């Protein structure tokens, strides 16, 4: 759970800046509500922590089909709601972080690949 992980990272490692990506939400409104609720709790119990909203990934049936096929949803169903959200996330991260290249860790590697796909697609349009 995001709150538990944030507590560990803040209290044990001094990390104060976080991005929240709401996953498996009904829509953007629900994603923002998750962010607002978490922000209120964090502001109350973890002073000095900053959470930015990175967006949301909505639940859609095509996402599950991609998982079943063992293919990234963005490849097999590029126009699905979740694929559009992944592209929006990649654009957000590119704008936020410029052209920094992740150098370590599996999550950084995944995000780098996701951002590269988004760059290639935006150039093709």
Q: What are the language-model segments listed below?
A:
Residues 1-18:
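Conserved C-terminal guanine-recognition region of P-loop GTPase G domains, centered on the G4
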Residues 16-125:
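C-terminal lobe/tail of nucleotide-utilizing enzymes
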């Amino acid at each position: 759970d995001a709150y538990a992980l944030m507590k560990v990272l803040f209290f044990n490692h001094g990390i104060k800046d976080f991005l929240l990506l709401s996953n498996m939400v009904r829509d953007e409104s629900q994603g923002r509500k998750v962010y607002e609720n978490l922000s209120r709790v964090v502001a109350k119990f973890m002073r000095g922590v900053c959470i930015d909203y990175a967006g949301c990934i909505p639940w859609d049936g095509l996402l599950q089909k991609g998982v079943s096929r063992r293919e990234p949803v963005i490849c097999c169903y590029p126009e699905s709601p979740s694929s559009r959200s992944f592209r929006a996330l990649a654009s957000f991260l590119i704008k936020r972080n410029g052209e920094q290249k992740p150098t370590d860790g599996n999550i950084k590697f995944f995000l780098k690949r996701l951002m590269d796909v988004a760059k290639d697609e935006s150039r093709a349009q």
